[in-house]
Amino acid sequence: MKRLNDEQRSPREPHESIALNPGDLATFYARVSEMSGRDRTLDLSTIRIGERLLDDPVAAISPGGAAPGELILVCDGTEILRDQEAVKPMVVAALQAAGTDCTVITLAASDGHELHTTPDQIATVREHLRVDVAVVVLGSGTVTDVTKHAVYEFERETGNRLSLTVIQTANSVCAFTSGLAVVTTGGVKRTVPSRLPDRLA
């Protein structure tokens, strides 16, 4: 095997790091696109971070701060507490107080034990989706994968894009910032193309 000496090797370009400011994704996308020579903009346009974020869920859902008229909120039955208050009913109450017509879909495990991203769960969410209805996920990576894939299928079938916001209740799960979903079919997990959220909180 022929080996190249140091003089024959192509010089490596110096790597330039890019700081990611979650509050300014537009600048990050523009810088990455400039460096790579192609558009790298993703559908995820907003990331909101804050200890009291849930005090105003409308701000997380709507960039302009106006409450959507009709909204579907998808969650599971797992109780999440903040300051001894149940988070999911608190968010629903805040959305309703802002004038939003909020339909809550609570996913339940078919075997009574653990929720999985299955075609049946995806279909449960899919049948509630309609044009011009905002969709919000409040929960874990599994609920997020179920919902974003239901939205993905709806958009492919109808050609209509829906607003999708994820309010995460787990610290670090790929589902929140991935354009893929892990779907369990016949007991086998498969990673399939799906959809990024528009906003993450």
Give residue ranges: language-model regions.
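Surface-exposed, flexible loop/turn segments at secondary-structure boundaries
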Residues: 79, 143, 172
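Short hydrophobic alpha-helical segments that form membrane-spanning helices or hydrophobic packing faces
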Residues: 57, 147-148, 179
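ATP/NTP phosphate-donor binding region
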Residues: 2-134
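A glycine/threonine-rich phosphate-anchoring loop and its flanking beta-alpha core
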Residues: 45, 152-201
